Amino acid sequence: ALTRITASLEGAPASSSAKELAARVEAALHEGDTLMGVTPEAVGIAVRRALGAALSWDDIDFEVIHGPVVDPMINVAMDETLVEDVAAGRRKPFMRLWEWNGPQVVIGSFQSYQNEIQQGGVERYGITVSRRVTGGGAMFMEPGNCITYSLVIPTALVEGMSFEQAYPYLDQWVMEVLDKLGIKARYVPLNDIASEAGKIGGAAQKRWASGYMVHHVTMAYDIDAIKMNEVLRIGMEKIRDKGTRSAVKRVDPMRSQTGLPREEILQAFFDHFKEKYNASVGTITEEDLRVARERCETKFARPEWVHRIP
């Protein structure tokens, strides 16, 4: 079988995708052939990597960034503006831990504002509502109640992978951190992270034609569930399903399962990524913030973006 597989790949165009290469391998297999510890897809990805068309983690010169503390919408804008900087070569690929100074709800790119948001709760608590560039569900975020990070990378790192494969691949380092913290976590397809005690968080992605992407994750640290249910419509629906409004007062998987302050968990994330990928420590500059504020004015804060019909 190995001889046939090798022959099937010889003469293939260098521009062949991992999927196309996998199809060649599949076609070369005879009935009864068994590949031990490898799949046709894995062979395709390996060939692409050997050609320099697909990347490994070790190929990327990363930065790791914490913060800064910014107005709620700035983080959302930077998920777009900083990707542009990386694609233009002005910044290295990076992992950035978010910090924010006010309450916010961040809805997914394809969600309906009206279907997700209870306007009365938003006004009552002075909450900023933002629409991010990635898909996924609504995130209720007050200062200190969540752990959120953005990973900006070349899409070549997940060349040939399906979305279902890419999510756990990009968050394998997170699973290692959670294990160190005493949480036995796993990925629940497509994009949820859960432990034996239930869901911890979720991930979302956006890929650009520039060849770069943002992958971000939000994990609940200690959320006021009562307030969340007054702000998010889906929260009200879940409470009604349970038949009670007082059943759950807090959603706190990261706090209750680790027993650690949020700051220690963030430091564990920061240190593990830095050490695992030999990342240098990066910063967000005043120019980065200026560009993000401008993008808020021209896009992210505008009603036609926040309230757009997907």
Locate predicted features.
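Residues that cap or initiate secondary-structure elements
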Residues: 13, 70, 103, 113, ...
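Active-site-adjacent structural elements in enzyme catalytic domains
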Residues: 127
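Active-site- and interface-proximal helix/loop "cap" or "latch" segments in soluble metabolic
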Residues: 1-56, 254
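Active-site loop/lid in soluble adenylation, ligation, and acyl-transfer enzymes
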Residues: 41-120, 124, 132, 235-238, ...
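Catalytic beta-strand/loop module used to bind and position nucleotide/cofactor moieties
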Residues: 1-2, 7, 110, 118-119, ...
